[in-house]
């Protein structure tokens, strides 16, 4: 039986996105820009480089107010050209 994400979450809730993308200086700014459009706030993303330094992971935590916000952010973060994966 498949459980849907909205059945597991109770809103509002704290939700962290982990965005993996190319190790380019603009990655963090692009991630924060997308998040600000849907969940305005003061963010301090955590950045970790990959072992070879080709990629960075950017973790950013929001207070989600509804499931549509969570799903829209997954989609829009994934649409950033230099992003490879969103968890």
Swiss-Prot record:
Q: Which Pfam families match?
A: DUF493
What the entry lists under Gene3D superfamilies is as follows: 3.30.70.260
Top-rank taxon? Bacteria
Q: Which GO terms describe its cellular component?
A: cytosol
Q: Which PANTHER family match?
A: UPF0250 PROTEIN YBED
Q: Which family does it belong to?
A: Belongs to the UPF0250 family.
Please identify the protein, giving its name as recorded: UPF0250 protein PC1_1177
Source organism (scientific name): Pectobacterium carotovorum subsp. carotovorum (strain PC1)
């Amino acid at each position: 039986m498949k459980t849907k994400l909205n059945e597991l979450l109770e809103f509002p809730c704290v939700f962290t996105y982990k965005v993996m993308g190319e190790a380019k200086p603009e990655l963090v700014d692009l991630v924060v820009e997308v998040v600000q459009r849907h969940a305005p706030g003061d963010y301090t993303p955590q950045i970790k480089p990959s072992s070879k330094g080709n990629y960075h992971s950017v973790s950013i935590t929001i207070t989600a107010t509804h499931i549509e916000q969570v799903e829209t952010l997954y989609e829009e973060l994934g649409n950033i050209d230099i992003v490879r994966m969103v968890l």
